[in-house]
Amino acid sequence: MEFCGCLSELMNGESSSKRNGPSTLPVKEVRTDMRSKYSSDLSSYTSACKKDSNLKSFDSSLHQRTNIIITSLAARAETQSLNLDSLMEVYGFLLELNQNAVRVIIESREDVWKNKDLKSLVDVYFKSTSKTLDFCNTVENCVKRTEISQLIIRFAVKQFEAESVDTDLGGDKKKKKYTKTLEELNKFKAMGDPFDGELVTQFDSVYDQQVLFLEELRKQRRKLDKKQRNVKTLRTVSNVFFATAYVSVLVLSVVATTMSAPPVVCAVASGSTAPIEITGKWFSQMWKKYEKAVKRQRGLVLTMESRVQVNNEAMKNIRSDVDELRSWVSSILETVDFAVEREEEEEAMGLAMQGIKKHVDGFTEKMEEVGENAAKCSKFIALGRLLVLEHILGLPAN
């Protein structure tokens, strides 16, 4: 039954995409080999948590925050409401992880400066955060294009109001009464969907960078373990980075899977808050849940042929608003000829345009909110990067 349920979910999702939006573009295949591939690293991390109280505290906090984000994604998946807010929530979570990593770097700045391998980790950190900045910038650019569309539709409303009071309708001019209004409405349609393929490209880029980051950390951690086994600070920093990267890939994997198969993320979230005696073991336990859920759903993540365009799902609510606006516009265009002939219908037309105006106000307000969130995310990441540079570059060379 679970197998059939998964297939049904996928078929429903695919048919819905065909009905409600453009064909989907492929997204990155989700990683499911993490637990087995990094089993020794996870064991090392668990052992380190037992010996290091600071690392144990970090792990406990990380566990709690990860449970929150996974539970939130599961709740949204159950209601089929994964949208731009969900994606921004995930990136806010990743931002928080990066900020915590920055604090660890600063607290260990002397060791960072003296150890070339640890400095290499910092370099990888900057490369990783630059990808997140790119994504935030893309969101902001999409918001700017959306604002242009809303200015056009607002102007269309003003044109309608102006042309509605124009009584100079002689002969054939009656049919041309709303010419300017129609021109603006057509411009609005021509603008299309401001949230195009850029977002899915940026999401893939961030995801790839996180996986590369994790692989590089794996190599660097082993070097540090061999060279600096007795240096507590170095082990702590490397473990913090490893945990941050590992959880980032886990959460991004769950997000990508949720786009096409909500039951998977729900299975991951179920029981994820249960107490685990050994600190650090929750990494393996959570990923094990994820693997089992995927296998139950016919190896969903590994074999899925029907990929999902991330921005189609992430921007679901936004696209719904635009589709509703287009529906109103289409209805308005059909009633224009009748509205100019009958006063009652013209008043109805005016009410319809006022309704559009109110809806656009709410839409624009939401877009501004998303833009502010993206700008805030960019600002915090940029400040964190500068803060790291100030502390590291400000240290004496000797």
Swiss-Prot record:
Put simply, this protein is called UPF0496 protein At5g66660
Q: A Pfam family name for this chain?
A: DUF677
Q: Keywords of this protein's UniProt record, alphabetized?
A: Membrane, Transmembrane, Transmembrane helix
Q: How does it sit in the membrane?
A: Multi-pass membrane protein
Presence of keyword ATP-binding: no
Q: Which GO terms describe its cellular component?
A: membrane
Cytoplasm among the record's keywords?
no
- Database matches in InterPro entries: DUF677
Transmembrane feature ranges: 240-260, 263-283
Q: Which family does it belong to?
A: Belongs to the UPF0496 family.
